[in-house]
């Protein structure tokens, strides 16, 4: 593994911890959207004077085959960064993203071109430094394709939008590896603040349901350290940030901890395995397939933990229909074990959150971020970042997190979010076998 990956920070006290959510729901059959996450991102950028670091997986305006209404998040983020750089020319801004946005060198990203022209460096992560998540294919690719690089243009259609790309863009895509992180670090003039999320500045994803955590203090500096490692992985570096590090506020009863890659799995398993009879464990997840997590949930049910699992039905992907794998076979397995599962009732958008909350007798723990609960996301293959918050149950981020989950689970306030398990159940044998095979071998997109 590259240096700095699989990172676990200390637990840091924090005073300004905010839970944020983007909601999509229907009222009388009409889809509506409420968004908080990128409003907060733009506010953080506007307040920055010393440093802005953006690390986002999807940063483009591609819609795929989707025709639903969307928000031009990619333009809005690019414009916000360029405008702030013009206001404060000495402001240090870095953008880190995944090379999927340029089709692995096959099609220039207009946003990256504009950012570079404004004096903002853009680092597309060197994915060749990462372990292969699809080893049956990647050996062939490394030997026969990688040495020849890629070139712009070609005769094949762009799989995500307009333009044409080479066959090598498609062959690169089949490695199924990514910098999947989604975060922002910025100062507010006096201290460092950070935001970790499941949301992308991607127009085709702008209606997705997502969550985020905004926080300040030493945990934000820990996140910055983990991002320095991401720059180093691609041969880049961050200049010194001219901002004093404030001491931890020992009066706070909340702690924030940064975890990346496999450290997310270890933290998640600890949350589930430590839950006792009568404790409450709630999960909202876009992809759930990791066998260790699934078995831990079943064991928690046996111990008497009260579980609620809200899953995306895996039927929509930017205008394309999906086959329900992995979530529908996994949901069948969970319901067979007695766990209550509900589905997000999506209409083109995705239920994209990656969120887990444990409520025990003395302390509440919440985990959220970029990390789906799959082998590829949890086993040091993709690059991922999540955060863990711990503290008393009545603390504001936990109240808001519970309210967000309950609203979706119970369809509160006249808003329709979710349906019973039976609505999207698939109990056929072949999807279960296919899911197990795809999860084990890496021959999958999840």
Positions of PLM-derived features:
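Charged, low-complexity intrinsically disordered terminal segments
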Residues: 1-446
């Amino acid at each position: 593994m590259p240096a700095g990956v699989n990172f676990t920070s200390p637990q840091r006290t924090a005073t300004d911890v905010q839970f944020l959510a983007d909601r999509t729901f229907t009222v009388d059959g009409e889809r509506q959207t409420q968004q908080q996450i990128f409003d907060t991102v733009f506010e953080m950028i506007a307040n920055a004077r010393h440093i802005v670091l953006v690390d986002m997986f999807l940063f483009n305006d591609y819609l795929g085959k989707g025709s639903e209404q969307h928000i031009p998040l990619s333009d809005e983020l690019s414009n916000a960064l360029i405008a702030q750089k013009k206001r404060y020319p000495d402001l240090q801004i870095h953008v880190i993203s995944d090379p999927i946005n340029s089709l692995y060198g096959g099609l220039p990203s207009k946003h990256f071109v504009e950012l570079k022209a404004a004096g903002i460096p853009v680092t597309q992560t060197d994915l060749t430094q990462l372990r292969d998540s699809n080893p049956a294919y990647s050996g062939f690719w490394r030997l026969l394709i990688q040495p020849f690089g890629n070139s712009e243009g070609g005769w094949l259609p762009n799989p995500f939008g307009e333009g044409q790309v080479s066959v090598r863009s498609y062959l690169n895509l089949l490695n199924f590896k990514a910098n999947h992180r989604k975060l922002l670090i910025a100062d507010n003039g006096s201290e460092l603040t950070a935001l970790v999320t499941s949301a992308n500045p991607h127009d085709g994803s702008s209606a997705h349901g997502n969550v985020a955590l905004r926080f300040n203090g030493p945990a934000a500096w820990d996140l910055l350290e983990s991002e320095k490692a991401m720059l180093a992985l691609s041969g880049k570096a961050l200049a010194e940030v001219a901002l004093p590090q404030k001491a931890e506020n020992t009066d706070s009863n909340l702690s924030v901890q940064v975890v990346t890659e496999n450290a997310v799995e270890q933290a998640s398993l600890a949350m589930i395995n430590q839950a006792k009879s009568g404790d409450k464990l709630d999960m909202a997840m876009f992809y759930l397939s990791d066998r260790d997590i699934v078995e831990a949930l079943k064991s928690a049910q046996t111990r008497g933990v009260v579980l609620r699992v809200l899953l995306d039905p895996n039927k929509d992907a930017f205008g394309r229909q999906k086959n329900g794998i992995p979530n529908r076979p996994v949901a069948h397995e969970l319901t067979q074990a007695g766990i209550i599962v509900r589905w997000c009732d999506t209409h083109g958008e995705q239920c994209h959150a990656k969120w887990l909350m444990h409520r025990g007798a003395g302390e509440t723990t919440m985990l959220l971020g970029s990390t789906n609960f799959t082998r590829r996301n949890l086993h040091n293959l993709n690059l991922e970042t999540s955060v863990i918050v711990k503290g008393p149950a009545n603390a504001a981020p936990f109240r808001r997190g519970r309210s967000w989950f309950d609203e979706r689970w119970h369809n509160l306030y006249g808003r329709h979010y979710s349906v019973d398990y039976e609505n999207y159940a698939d109990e056929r044998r072949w999807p279960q076998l296919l899911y197990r095979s795809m999860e084990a071998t890496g021959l999958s997109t999840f």
